[in-house]
């Protein structure tokens, strides 16, 4: 391995696409033909090597990006197999951040599907060079040319066709290689391991010549000298064509398109050749952006084995045998097991325990790794996804990954109180693995609330809690965090007096209650508060030592409003006058008086129920705009803007959180899964009276 493990010989690639396009099957075939798997795993039999989690084998979908290393010709290929379900886009995003190139797999029947669009946009964000593999050419209804048109129309991508299919559907038997101008036919009886080249069938020669001319027209544009030779009728060599295709792919001038049927073992070896020939090595990427810790300056750092060590942690995974594994992509320098490095994001030293090369869920211990490698480290204590590991003497922080906010939440509780601690540990471990999964405690209900990217995402979290941590949980729908406020100002004069033998109680307070939005002279430090208390007592009408009792009483009682028992927010209470008794007054008496004044003030202040309003952004193809806007309006949404973004539309709206539960599924069905959305908390607003009546009735 070490002899050939030089930067120009490494290909760090991802295989990504929509669910069911055949990514995992394609990866399985790659592992088979590169000699890593002795038998081919079939997804529909639950035996694929890459799909190593139990849930994945049951569902036949890829949930976590398994990393694996294999070898083709004299090149090392590190493959990340990514999930295709929309709930797991974070896994795709994490992978793309550390890859140099990607293979986008398309279903030859369905063409460009919704998740294909999402993944393509994510790859654009990280400027990842990529090629396309039109899979399932043996299936009924497969149409290579239609799929290529969809790549152009839906993704706005300039495709460079390198192969044409020979035969369609069940008669698909091979491809035409437009670079060599030869037909490649696979022998079925050898599981696709054997294939032979022959002349292009007579009935396809004209079409092959037409597409070969297109290929040359697009590639020679990249080199003026070769273009002049081409225009003067000179023959361009196969090697020159390959160099131009590589240049155009790395610069994203176009995207090479290949075809085949991974399941039927046709087209995989030419795909491997293309990965090696056209996708970039770490040297082609050249630099990585980061910040030099000593100067706080942003710089471009060269990707090189001779530079000081730097790496990005892009995934944390719990391994049943090794414990916590941190997957890293090394950008510069080298590292040995047992070495000490620094986590520059957390400013903590880490000691490398075991260092592993991963093959799905099998592992191989290694002693050293260097720039370009993707390896798993055991024994790290403080490193989380997105952190930088760096040389202790020359510290850098690499560009961080961005993670979307979760959009769906559920309340969970253990089925037995004995499991409470175990559940807390399980959830914190799972949250450490997955930045798009968050855990919080609702301070009002005491419930543990889990948040994720979709219902399937949370289902799998709960399933993993049960299988890996042996914690059974009850799940429920979370409650919306309603609030209450007053809408008009009022002045309350309240006296608390108690005389019934023994020490008496006496306190009088005069308090002005007013909505915060109406306060003209609000101090800067109070502008982000939901409750403000001020004392304007002069002349000792209420002694200084009793005033904290007034504030404490108001703070305690405002947790339970009078409309439906929700906390009161967005109001100011000003203590303007009062009276006390030398013997009977106390802090407690003024606390009780303040509570009495609050109850009266809230009644007179025209109280209203408030609800959280979310800022919702929907990205959708044009054709679904009408349905999506109609649906948002029916959810009491207020449309703020509609703007074009690339070949999609972005709708921004403010929608009550109570109306957004289950929206992810509605949006999928409205847009056939092609639209995506994000939402963040914006503000609290009044609940319409007819809705408020329903909420009060439920309390």
Swiss-Prot record:
Record flagged with keyword Hydrolase: no
UniProt key word GTP-binding: yes
Binding site for GTP: 17-24, 81-85, 135-138
GO biological process, one term: ribosome disassembly
InterPro entries, alphabetized: EF-G-like_DII, EFG_II, EFG_III, EFG_III/V, EFG_IV, EFG_V, EFG_V-like, G_TR_CS
GO molecular function: GTP binding; GTPase activity; translation elongation factor activity
Record domain tr-type G: where: 8-283
GO cellular component: cytoplasm
Keywords per UniProt: Cytoplasm, Elongation factor, GTP-binding, Nucleotide-binding, Protein biosynthesis
Subcellular location per the Swiss-Prot or TrEMBL entry: Cytoplasm
HAMAP family registered for this protein in UniProt: EF_G_EF_2_B
PANTHER family tied to this protein: RIBOSOME-RELEASING FACTOR 2, MITOCHONDRIAL (PTHR43261:SF1), TRANSLATION ELONGATION FACTOR G-RELATED (PTHR43261)
Similarity comment text for this entry: Belongs to the TRAFAC class translation factor GTPase superfamily. Classic translation factor GTPase family. EF-G/EF-2 subfamily.
Function of the protein: Catalyzes the GTP-dependent ribosomal translocation step during translation elongation. During this step, the ribosome changes from the pre-translocational (PRE) to the post-translocational (POST) state as the newly formed A-site-bound peptidyl-tRNA and P-site-bound deacylated tRNA move to the P and E sites, respectively. Catalyzes the coordinated movement of the two tRNA molecules, the mRNA and conformational changes in the ribosome.
The protein, known as: Elongation factor G
Organismal lineage: Bacteria, Pseudomonadati, Pseudomonadota, Alphaproteobacteria, Rickettsiales
